[in-house]
């Protein structure tokens, strides 16, 4: 969180935010599944100005063998921001933030995967941020979950994610870049809606106990809306495949 420039209003007296949204409104979200031919599974997501692609490879035999688990597959996640994803060119390669977010995303996805079905193997998830505009970790989790489903990895449920936060003393849904930079708090949440499980819960900033509870409830509500969009994106892909099969008969 940065110090807010003098005169900048993140929310006006009518409850409208800097990008015109209401307090509890998501940014526009577009999802597409199966965008990469050479990956076992893939997904592309546009979330506000974020543009993120996720690819899944595996399960495949893990080398070197001493890293193998005899009872389950190992999930490996790499989150990376392209050098051109932000206004000031980012130095290529992993940095501390990317390594930390990779671990966070792995922790959010792992409870959904039935890894016991693939002992001695690895499942690799690559998340590439092409354009960043706040909320890349929740968008990355959402895209990666879709890519895992597209790869046919057995899952207990999809993982959907969303963040809530606090700006100008108000709890709002889905912070954009200015709100993330100059707001007071950010609460990213990931859930498995069918199981009613939370797989990620973080907080950056300061909230009272009541504000925290309100933010978590709002983020869960947002994640459930994201979950419906995930389901629609998967249905769209498999309807297209069904139509192609029918057309070739």
Swiss-Prot record:
Alphabetized InterPro entries for the sequence: ExoRNase_PH_dom1, ExoRNase_PH_dom2, ExoRNase_PH_dom2_sf, PNPase/RNase_PH_dom_sf, Ribosomal_Su5_D2-typ_SF, RNase_PH, Rrp41
EC number(s) given by UniProt: 3.1.13.-
Location in the cell: Cytoplasm
Effect caused by changing residue 204 to A: Decrease in activity
Entry-linked Gene3D superfamilies: GHMP Kinase, N-terminal domain
Chief site of localization: cytoplasm
Effect in UniProt of substituting residue 91 to E: Does not affect ring assembly, but abolishes RNA degradation
Keyword Cell inner membrane: no
EC top class named in words: hydrolase
GO terms classed as biological process: gene expression; rRNA catabolic process
Superkingdom field: Archaea
Keyword terms of this UniProt record: Cytoplasm, Exonuclease, Exosome, Hydrolase, Nuclease
Gene Ontology MF: a single term: 3'-5'-RNA exonuclease activity
Substitution effect: residue 186 to A: Abolishes RNA degradation
Gene Ontology CC: cytoplasmic exosome (RNase complex)
Family: Belongs to the RNase PH family. Rrp41 subfamily.
Quaternary structure and interacting proteins, as annotated: Component of the archaeal exosome complex. Forms a hexameric ring-like arrangement composed of 3 Rrp41-Rrp42 heterodimers. The hexameric ring associates with a trimer of Rrp4 and/or Csl4 subunits.
Function of the protein: Catalytic component of the exosome, which is a complex involved in RNA degradation. Has 3'->5' exoribonuclease activity. Can also synthesize heteromeric RNA-tails.
Protein's recorded name: Exosome complex component Rrp41
Lineage per the UniProt record: Archaea, Methanobacteriati, Methanobacteriota, Thermococci, Thermococcales
